[in-house]
C-alpha cells in the first residue's frame, strides 16, 4: 500500500520474469476471453476498471473493480506475483563500490549503474540503497580519494547514474533532491534513463 505502481513498472516486471513458465497470459486494459487470461479492462458504462481471470472453460470471473486504473494495476500485480510464485527480487546495489571511474579533458566522472526494477514492495529498500550509494560517491569526491590515481586537475566532477528501468516518482524525487544538494559545488549529477 501507499506506493502506486505504474503500467510501465508492471510491464517491466512481466518482461523481467518472462523466462518463468506461465500457463496464463496477462492483459493490461484489455478484455480477453481466452483460457487462463488474467488482466483488467475498463467498464465504461460503470466507469470502473475490472480485474478478471478467465477459467479453463473460458468463463470470465470478475475478481475486483476499482475507480482508478492504478488500483487495478496493483491488484493485477498481486495476482501475477501469487500465480508466478514470484518472490520479490532483492535489490542488487553494492553501496560500498564505485562502479567505474573515468576522466575526460577536464572532467572526472564516476559511473553508478542501477539495474534494479522499480516495484512497490522493494521500493523503500531500493531508495535507501541508492541514497547510501550516492552518499558514498559524494563522500569519495569530497574527501578526494581519487587524487592519488587521477590527480586533482578537474573542472567538474560528475556522478553519472544509469538506470536500466525508469525510476518511480519517489526515485525521481530522490535524484532531484541530490541534484539540489550539489548545486553550489563542483560536483554534478548526470542521469541517464532508459
Predicted regions and their residues:
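Intrinsically disordered, low-complexity charged/polar segments
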Residues: 82-88
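Helix-rich interaction surfaces within compact, conserved domain-sized segments
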Residues: 160-194
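N-terminal, charge-rich interaction modules
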Residues: 89-115
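Short aromatic-glycine-(Arg/Gly/Cys) micro-motifs in beta-strand/loop hairpins
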Residues: 30-61, 79-81
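Short glycine-rich, basic-tinged beta-strand/loop micro-motifs
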Residues: 108-118, 152-165
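Acidic, aromatic-enriched beta-alpha/helix-loop junctions
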Residues: 59-61, 124-147
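A short, charged, amphipathic alpha-helix used as a generic interaction element across diverse proteins
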Residues: 67-82
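Negatively charged, low-complexity tracts enriched in Asp/Glu with abundant Ser/Thr
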Residues: 2-32
